Amino acid sequence: MKLAIKLVCLTIVVSPLAQTSARALTADDLKRIGYDQRIGQPLARHLTFEDSDKRTVALGDLLNHKPTLLVLGYYHCPMLCSLINDGLIEALQELRFNVGRDFNVINVSIDPHETPAVAAVKKKEYLKRYARPGADGAWHFLTGTEQTITQLANEAGFRFKFDPVSNEYAHPSGFIVLTPEGKISRYFFGVNFDPKELRRAIATASNGRSGSVIHELVLLCSHYNPITGKYGVIVLKVLRAVSVMTVLLLAWWIVTLSRRHSTAEGG
């Protein structure tokens, strides 16, 4: 079921509405959410944030002359951000490259109300799952002011919207690969990431080069809504299809075993 949702929600997923009805964000709002691919665009290295240890750090200092994966989201995100980071960790675990030795990862919260304490909890969780030495000083979890977050998001081409009714954010899924100089080299979209493509992207960025513009498949995907207790139309169709396939495969497996058993008895 989780895989089916991840396959459908490739690029844009709206966080589930936990406290109110689903009419807080309109279709026009959703159309404005996404990425503007600004390949070659330098990010402002002087922008300052607070890290998970409550230290004020400049974005440029965290690059440390290495390629960097920039993940924009927020730590209290009830669904999408977890899927993005889950997919990222799965891809990273397939690489020979290591966080710290070969590249950095920077998670930045788009919620100005989130604190370094919240960031520290997420950092501990993800470093434990990544489980490779040397990542602690190179995988950063940052929080910032609304002004700083907005500037970074604008420069990165990251379009998101806050819903004051549900107190949540609608935002695109994916992450950005930066060169050691802080220029945008490539975008990755979705929640599942090809380790081979990621390896190539890191290698390309490490040489200061930029990749090409990637086609962004946009699916306005409704997901599980805790208010209605139902899945959205698109997801529901996929889940039904997966269920049918599962039943068919199970039936095929049973028939195959029965035939083998009959053959064995006949022999």
Where are these regions (language model features)?
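Extracytoplasmic/lumenal ectodomains and periplasmic regions of secretory and membrane proteins
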Residues: 162-221
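Extracytoplasmic
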Residues: 42-44, 64-67, 100-105, 136, ...
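Structural microenvironment flanking redox-active thiols in thiol-disulfide oxidoreductases
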Residues: 85-149
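Bacterial N-terminal signal peptides
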Residues: 6-16
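N-terminal "domain-start" segment that seeds a small globular fold
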Residues: 25-60, 86-90
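Short active-site neighborhood of thiol/selenol oxidoreductases, capturing the structured segment around
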Residues: 58-88, 105-106
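Juxtamembrane interface at the cytosolic side of transmembrane helices
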Residues: 247-267
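Juxtamembrane/start-of-transmembrane alpha-helix segments at the extracytoplasmic/lumenal side
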Residues: 224-245
